């Protein structure tokens, strides 16, 4: 006697209403074929449950903008955040159910603001790009640096992804019989036909989440300045088919929303349906839920937009934004702090040896200087 699980029985009922067989087929044959279909579907579901899913999430953004704090909260790790000096890696795991393998999220964080943008080539590879998502964290409390940080980092990722896609296309063309075939990378992002303003936007090549951090400081800004920042980020997010959310690590309710978006990118979970486009509140706008008509034109009162001579809509928004918040490049020009002198990375034995070698080097320099002076006197 055949024995089937409850899953097979429920699937069998569903198939019985949808399965059509020729009238000449005997009832027993129909029954057998339905059982086989049900058993095959159960086996397929079980094999999917046993397959480990691996995704990559790349965090970047404003220097000291709260990236590490946000990541630790999303991973529910009770650790004190430390400055990210260059590029750091960690991972997260989540089980889909009881006694099932845990899905893995590879998590990369870029430190230093825009100064180390060349390092994007490390996490973005031909292997990772097929399941890659990007999180851009922008410090709302420093609006003067916001546009330049955003533009440079997004361009760095765009360039690297394009490079990976191009290499894949070249490899495809080198295969016999594929020279004249048009190649579309399987990871290339394709928007639904009913996506708002589909013909007017430039979708980012991989899923993108823009986070406006330190909302607790930003909400005390002048209302007109808040309006400029909020509308500009709404435009940028919609233009790149990205999600946008404002948050503060001091707000549990806002951080819970961040966790939902993060889990969606890292593990494929539902991101929720919360939507908040009120400029007087923290923005929560999932990709595909905004439009240019809802965003409206750039917010500016003391300049004639027609006099800005913009090349395209994005350039117009940039010029209006930088008219209100001119870029202050001093903060980005500062070099990263020497990690060898940072007390949080102290190693007593190594530091002692380093100090000894430094003293020996200084003594060598002094002796060398004396010998050169002696030579000069002799001549």
Language model features with spans:
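Short, flexible boundary segments at extreme N-termini or domain junctions of P-loop NTPases and their
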Residues: 1-62, 91-95, 104, 116-117
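Switch I (effector-binding) loop of TRAFAC-class P-loop GTPase G-domains
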Residues: 42-44, 48-50, 75-106, 113-118, ...
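Short coil/turn segments at secondary-structure boundaries
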Residues: 46, 50, 70-76, 82-87, ...
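Glycine-rich phosphate-binding P-loop
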Residues: 55-75
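Inter-motif core of Ras-like GTPase G domains
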Residues: 118-143, 147-167, 179-182
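G-domain G4 guanine-recognition motif of GTPases
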Residues: 137-142, 165-188, 195-224, 244-256, ...
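Canonical P-loop GTPase G-domain recognition
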Residues: 218-290
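Extended non-globular C-terminal regions
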Residues: 302, 306-379
């Amino acid at each position: 006697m055949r024995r089937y699980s409850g899953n097979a029985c429920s699937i069998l009922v569903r198939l019985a209403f949808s399965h059509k067989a020729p009238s000449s087929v005997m009832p027993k044959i129909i029954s057998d074929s339905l059982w086989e279909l049900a058993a095959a579907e159960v086996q397929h579901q079980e094999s999917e449950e046993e397959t480990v899913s691996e995704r990559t999430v790349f965090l970047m953004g404003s220097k000291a903008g709260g990236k590490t704090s946000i990541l630790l909260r999303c991973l529910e790790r009770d650790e004190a955040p430390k400055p990210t000096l260059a590029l750091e890696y960690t991972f997260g795991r989540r089980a889909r159910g009881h006694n099932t393998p845990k899905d893995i999220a590879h998590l990369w964080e870029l430190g230093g603001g825009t100064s180390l943008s060349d390092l994007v080539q490390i996490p973005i590879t031909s292997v990772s790009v097929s399941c890659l998502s990007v999180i851009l964290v922008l410090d709302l409390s420093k609006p003067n640096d916001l546009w330049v940080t955003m533009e440079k980092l997004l361009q760095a990722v765009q360039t690297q992804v394009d490079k990976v896609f191009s290499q894949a296309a070249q490899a495809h063309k080198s295969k016999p019989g594929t020279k004249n075939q048009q190649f579309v990378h399987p990871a290339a992002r394709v928007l639904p036909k009913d996506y708002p303003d589909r013909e007017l936007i430039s979708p980012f090549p991989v899923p993108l989440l823009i986070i406006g951090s330190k909302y607790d400081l930003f909400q005390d800004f002048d209302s007109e300045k808040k309006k400029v920042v909020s509308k500009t980020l709404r435009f940028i997010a919609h233009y790149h088919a990205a999600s946008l959310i404002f948050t503060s690590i001091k707000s549990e309710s806002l951080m819970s929303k961040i966790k939902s978006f993060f889990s969606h990118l890292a593990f494929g979970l539902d991101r929720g349906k919360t939507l908040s486009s009120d400029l007087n509140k923290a923005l929560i706008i999932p990709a595909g839920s905004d439009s240019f008509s809802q965003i409206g034109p750039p917010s500016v009162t003391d300049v004639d937009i027609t006099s800005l001579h913009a090349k395209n809509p994005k350039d117009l928004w940039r010029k209006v934004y930088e008219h209100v918040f001119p870029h202050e490049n001093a903060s980005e020009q500062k070099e990263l702090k020497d990690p060898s002198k940072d007390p949080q990375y102290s190693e007593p034995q190594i530091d002692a040896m380093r100090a000894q070698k430094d003293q020996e080097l200084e003594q060598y320099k002094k002796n060398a200087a004396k010998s050169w002076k002696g030579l000069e006197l002799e001549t």
